[in-house]
Amino acid sequence: MAMTSWPSTGRQRRHQLASMLLLVLVVVGIYVPVFALLPSLSYTPQSLPSAIPQDEKMISRKFYIKDDNFWKDGNRFQIIGGDLHYFRVLPEYWEDRLLRANALGLNTIQVYVPWNLHEPKPGKMVFEGIGDLVSFLKLCEKLDFLVMLRAGPYICGEWDLGGFPAWLLAVKPRLQLRTSDPVYLKLVERWWDVLLPKVFPLLYSNGGPVIMVQIENEYGSYGNDKAYLRKLVSMARGHLGDDIIVYTTDGGTKETLDKGTVPVADVYSAVDFSTGDDPWPIFKLQKKFNAPGRSPPLSSEFYTGWLTHWGEKITKTDAEFTAASLEKILSRNGSAVLYMVHGGTNFGFYNGANTGSEESDYKPDLTSYDYDAPIKESGDIDNPKFQALQRVIKKYNASPHPISPSNKQRKAYGSIKMQMTTSLFDLVRMTDPADVITSANPISMESVGQMFGFLLYESSYIAKKSGNTLRIPKVHDRAQVFVSCLSQDVDVGVLRYIGTTERWNNQPISLPTIECTTNTSLFILVENMGRVNYGPYIFDDKGILSSVYLDGQILHGWKMIPIPFHNLNQEPNLTFEMQHTKNRSKKFELTNDVGRKEPALFAGEFSINSEEEIKDTYLSFNGWGKGVAFVNEFNIGRYWPSVGPQCNLYVPAPLLKRGKNTLVVFELESPHLELSLEAVDHQDFTCGSNVSKVNQL
C-alpha cells in the first residue's frame, strides 16, 4: 500500500489536519453508536466508555463462600431453596409452579439435569419442549430465583437409571459407570461439551441465575474413586471457569463423606440427612470435609416427603413436624433446599426403581411423583404443609413474597367409552421385518437398540401331552407368557394366556397340553417397568437376561420384536397404528376366561366444547388391569390400580384441546368390564390394599 505525503507548508498541514479531525469525529459519531448496539461484534471496554457501567455491574455480581457463609454481591446470603424438576412438569406450567415456590418464600431453585432426557440416542441431542433447560433457567432468572444446577452425569432422582442414557448399557466392552473408566469418561465429556456451554452464559457472574453446579450425586453411598470425581471437577471447571461454586452432596455420615467428597479447596461439600435428624452435629461433621472458612451449613436435600413404590402405602409426612425441623436449620443461619418443593409427574417411561439387598427385590416407582411436597402434583398449595413451611420461611426471608396463587381449576369430564382397536399381535404383524432380531438365545432390550417400553420374545417348541414346564431364571421386569398354534402359512390360531412371572416373584410356569399340527409357538411379552436409579444394582438391563428353559433344557431359536411406543422426548407414533388397524377383523380368537388377558390397544374420545372448559383432570383406572396411557398422543405414564396405591393419572390442561380429544390405552391384562374410563377432578391413592400412613423421616 502506497504512503501519502503531507503538503510542505505549515498552513496546509494545519488545514488538512483540521479537516481530517472533523472527518474522524463525524465517522466516530455515526459508526460507534450504530455498531455498539450489535451484540455479535466484539469490543474492549476501553474503546467504548458507554459500555463500562454494564461491565462494572457484571463484575459486581458475585456469589461466593467466605467465613463459613454464602455471600451474594458482598452480602451474607441464606439459601432457602427447593428442588423442582423441569422434566416432571409441562413447560406451559413451569412459570405457574415457580410462582408458587416464590409464594412459599424460596429464593433458590435446585434442579437436576437428566442426561437420558437430552441424549436419548447416541449423538441425538434434545433441548426442546420439556427438555428446554435454557428456557427453564431463564424463567427462574425472570422470577428472581437463583439456581443450583445438578449436572450429573449421575443424578439418582427416582429417574430411570439415575439419569444415565440406557444405551450406555449396550456399549461393549461393558462400561464401568460412575468410575474413572476412560471410555465412560469420554462419553461424559462429549455430553458435557454440549451441556455446559449452554450453562456458561447463565452463570451468576455472567448475569444469569446459576450460582452453584453439582457434580455426581451422593457418590459416597456408591463408590470411592477420587480420580473420577477430580476428573468431573476438571471438566466442569474447563467449561465454567474457576469462579463458579462446584459442589457435591453426600449423606451426613463420616463414611459417605469420606468416600464422596473431593479433597480440594475449591470444591464445596454439602450434606443431606433425614428430616428427623439433629442437623447441627451433621453440619459440624460437614466442616471437616471443607476447607477452613468454606463450610456454610447446607442441607441440600431437606426432605418434605418421600417416594412411593407400586404396592406400598402412600407416604405422608406430618406438616408441623416438617416445618419445625426446617426451623432448626434456618434459625441458626443454616441453609436448606426442600426436596421436593414440587414433585410433579413421571411422564412417559422415565420412572425409576429401587432394590433391596438382592437384585430381585425390585420396587418400581409410581407415575405420580407428588412426594407429599408442599406444592402438590397438580400445583395445589391449599394444604397444611405449604402453610406450615410458608409460616417458618417468612421469618427468615425478608424479601417481599407474592400472594399465593389460587389452585388450578379441575374438571370431571365424565365417562369415556373405549373400544378395542388393536391387539398386541396385530402390532406384531405391522412390525417391519427389518426391525425383528433373530438369535439363538434371548438378548436384552438394550442390545436390540430399544430403551423403553415392551419387547416380545417368540420361539417354538414341541408340546408334550403331559404339558411342559417353562423357567426364565432372570427376567427384567415382568413377563407375560402366551402360546398358540401358528405356522408360517397359517396365521390363525387360538392365543392362550398362560401366566406371568416377575423379577420379584420368579416362578416356573406350567404350559398346558395343546394339540397343534405344527410346533407350538411361544410368546413372552416383557415389560421394562423402570430402571434402578440408586444402589449397587444400577446396571439394570431389561428383557430376558438368561437362557429360557423348557423341561430343564435350554430353548433355542428366538425372535425379538420391539414394541417401544413413544417416550417423553420422542415423536408420537400411535397415529399410524390406530388408523391402520381400526377396522381390521381380529385374526386371533380369544378363549373365554383368559382371552381378556391378551394385551391390546383401546381407544376412546371425549369432547371439550370451548377453551374455557379446558381444565386439569385425572383419568381413573379403577376396574382396569395394568398398562400405559396416552392423551392426544402424549404418554402420561403407567397405571396399575390392582396393586396401587395410585388409582388415577394426572392430565394437565395443556395436553387437552377444544374439540375431540383422543385417549389410547395399552392394556396388558383386563380392561374394565364396561370398557369405559372416568375423567375425574381429583387424585386418588387408595387403590389396591393400601391406605395412607404418616411417616416422619
From Swiss-Prot:
Protein's name according to its UniProt entry: Beta-galactosidase 17
PROSITE patterns for this protein: GLYCOSYL_HYDROL_F35
Record keyword Secreted present: yes
Signal peptide: 1-35
GO cellular component: apoplast
Subcellular location: Secreted, Extracellular space, Apoplast
Swiss-Prot/TrEMBL catalytic activity: Hydrolysis of terminal non-reducing beta-D-galactose residues in beta-D-galactosides
Glycan attachment points: 333, 519, 573, 583, 690
